[in-house]
């Protein structure tokens, strides 16, 4: 990245740091784990030699160069538990995020803690305007992680990724710097009262745009579906 270093970066429980060759065996071990690799696109098996090449290829860097990618180690109490992938476009203003976590540490909140800290640092100190992420549509846990960080679902690319010999769909999410503060400062308490109001021509457009998280749509009907049910019972 530019002159200022991105790493190391500390969170309440984690240290985000550059990889070292001492991490190669651990990186290879969890990247070969079927539970970790299931929704990822790296070649399998992910050998120690492949891990060493990845680490050596970014030696001396503390973050991605413009137009490149960089793997960030997620360290918990001196132990490698996963990694973040960070890509930057040529302008340095558009970032792409990826993440993977050891299967025995999934469900710990480490991935969202690490990704959230990285995103905040990119927005606050490095002039990044937008962070994007893509995922396998079947990876509901990853979609929920992005939703918890404030990402917005932007659509599905049909057969847009060639993964291990097959064309696959991917779901696309993004978060703007302008939206991050609003998300972090949103109200977490239930409203004191709820009022039912008539839908009128003046408010219909706003009502129609109401939505829930993508992963909750099978529990909560969309507004277009609700309108259709009311009009055509």
State what each model feature region is:
Residues 1-39, 71-197, 202:
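Acyl-donor (CoA/ACP) binding surface of acyl/acetyltransferases
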